[in-house]
Amino acid sequence: MDYFTLFGLPIRYDVDGGLLASRFQDLQRQFHPDRYATSPECERMLAVQLAATINNAYQALKHPLKRAEYMLSLHGFDVNNEQHTMRDTAFLMEQLELREELDTISQRSDADEVLTTFAERLQVMIGTRRSHMRHELDNETWTDAADTVRKLRFLDKLQQQVEELEEQLLDR
């Protein structure tokens, strides 16, 4: 059973977060291992496995990028497979330039302002890619969606680096 079906949701990228959380809580209550404490060993083990599956499913569906990755996995695309190389050299060059730019920001006297501008630009890039991804998933163009998800993963890592630098600048 796929994660969407487990939560009684249609298989599509856009998910009602409130409904997802509500169904998660219902499933947690229904299959919590403590409810099976006096049950036979096989039922207790099944409850533990179900609880783990429910938690994994919730985490996968809750986060937009993980949800897209999961949807692609349902169609045979493993975006976590590092053997698939990024062939978009323009995107890779852009990533190198962005990382170099981020590396130089901390050395600047106006690092806070420059980092804010950089973070805003990055958010626009992420928003644009997410829009492309949503369109590709909705239209079931799985190969294009997988490519976009891989690009979003690069941008997501860059976003994490921005947040780390923001914390470092606050600690100064």
Curated annotation (Swiss-Prot):
Signal sequence region: none
PROSITE patterns given in the database record: DNAJ_2 (PS50076)
Single biological process term from Gene Ontology: protein complex oligomerization
GO molecular function, one term: protein-folding chaperone binding
UniProt domain J: residue ranges: 2-74
The keyword Chaperone is annotated on this UniProt entry: yes
InterPro entries for this protein: DnaJ_domain (IPR001623), HscB (IPR004640), HscB_C_sf (IPR036386), HscB_oligo_C (IPR009073), J_dom_sf (IPR036869)
Gene Ontology CC annotations of this record: iron-sulfur cluster transfer complex
Keywords from the UniProt entry: Chaperone
CDD domains noted in UniProt: DnaJ (cd06257)
Lineage: superkingdom: Bacteria
Family, similarity comment: Belongs to the HscB family.
NCBIfam families: hscB, PRK05014.1
Subunit structure, as described in the record: Interacts with HscA and stimulates its ATPase activity. Interacts with IscU.
Matching HAMAP family: HscB
Protein's job: Co-chaperone involved in the maturation of iron-sulfur cluster-containing proteins. Seems to help targeting proteins to be folded toward HscA.
Identification of the protein by name: Co-chaperone protein HscB
Source organism: Pectobacterium atrosepticum (strain SCRI 1043 / ATCC BAA-672) (Erwinia carotovora subsp. atroseptica)
Recorded name of the encoding gene: hscB
